[in-house]
């Protein structure tokens, strides 16, 4: 599991590549008394305590996001941190590293779904601070059980199957905690891809509020 095969256990939409990197990142230029200074847009938003999860989740993405959370906690342990989520999911263990950090740090973590929060993306969305889990009106949210693939000798397949079942139990128990749904219902609903609108996600307990456009 913790060898090169650990990434066989995933939680994602297959049509999205979890290693897809951002392309053409915009740059913003700020004027100061010392002249101009250029930032990539994500670094600039980090100064406003805004983090983007806009790709699939792997170890590299997880390490970067955890580092940003820890940095912002050190900057101000009392001010909220916002995570915007548009992710198809990815590595379960990498996602749990982000989740554990969200729960461990002092600031409340506001989670906001834009686009799609699927699989581990939806799990992280639900793990935001209660009352501060949000979604934009046309976003989509999907939960399901971890996906797994096993290869090698029979004993290796058995070990990986046990690990998948362990991760499934862990994720479903935490989803039940964050949604106030019964574990039995979570187990049933995650047997297949379970898509929800933002309004349905509020009713389900995955989020707390839909951000409405009042213009």
Curated annotation (Swiss-Prot):
Localization (cell): Cytoplasm
Keyword annotations from UniProtKB, A to Z: Cytoplasm, Hydrolase, Protease, Serine protease
Keyword Protease recorded: yes
A GO-annotated cellular component: cytoplasm
Gene Ontology biological-process annotations: protein quality control for misfolded or incompletely synthesized proteins
Main location: cytoplasm
Domain of life: Bacteria
EC number: 3.4.21.92
Xref: SUPFAM superfamilies: ClpP/crotonase
Cleavable signal peptide: none
Coiled-coil positions: none
CDD domains: S14_ClpP_2 (cd07017)
GO molecular function list: ATP-dependent peptidase activity; ATPase binding; serine-type endopeptidase activity
Active site: 119 (nucleophile), 144
Catalytic activity: Hydrolysis of proteins to small peptides in the presence of ATP and magnesium. alpha-casein is the usual test substrate. In the absence of ATP, only oligopeptides shorter than five residues are hydrolyzed (such as succinyl-Leu-Tyr-|-NHMec, and Leu-Tyr-Leu-|-Tyr-Trp, in which cleavage of the -Tyr-|-Leu- and -Tyr-|-Trp bonds also occurs)
Purpose of the protein: Cleaves peptides in various proteins in a process that requires ATP hydrolysis. Has a chymotrypsin-like activity. Plays a major role in the degradation of misfolded proteins.
Subunit structure, as described in the record: Fourteen ClpP subunits assemble into 2 heptameric rings which stack back to back to give a disk-like structure with a central cavity, resembling the structure of eukaryotic proteasomes.
Family assignment from sequence similarity: Belongs to the peptidase S14 family.
NCBIfam families (alphabetical): clpP, PRK00277.1, PRK12553.1
Record's protein name: ATP-dependent Clp protease proteolytic subunit 3
Organism for this UniProt entry: Prochlorococcus marinus subsp. pastoris (strain CCMP1986 / NIES-2087 / MED4)
């Amino acid at each position: 599991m913790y060898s090169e095969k650990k990434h066989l256990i995933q939680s994602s939409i297959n049509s999205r590549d979890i290693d897809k990197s951002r392309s053409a990142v915009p740059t913003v230029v700020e004027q100061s008394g010392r002249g101009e200074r250029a930032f990539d847009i994500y670094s600039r938003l980090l100064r406003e305590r805004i983090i983007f999860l806009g790709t699939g989740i792997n170890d590299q993405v997880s390490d970067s996001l955890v580092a940003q959370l820890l940095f912002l906690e050190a900057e101000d342990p009392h001010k909220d941190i916002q995570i915007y989520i548009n992710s198809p999911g990815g590595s379960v263990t990498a996602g749990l590293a982000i989740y554990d950090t969200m729960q461990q740090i002092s600031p409340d973590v506001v989670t906001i779904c834009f686009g799609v929060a699927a699989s581990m993306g939806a799990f992280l969305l639900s793990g935001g601070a209660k009352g501060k889990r949000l979604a934009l009106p046309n976003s989509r949210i999907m939960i399901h059980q971890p996906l797994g693939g096993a290869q090698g000798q029979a004993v290796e397949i058995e070990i990986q199957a046990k690990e998948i079942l362990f991760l499934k139990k862990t994720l479903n128990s935490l989803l039940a905690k964050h949604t106030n749904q019964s574990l039995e219902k979570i187990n049933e609903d995650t047997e297949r891809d379970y898509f929800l609108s933002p309004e349905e996600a509020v009713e389900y307990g995955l989020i707390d509020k839909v951000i409405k456009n009042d213009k």
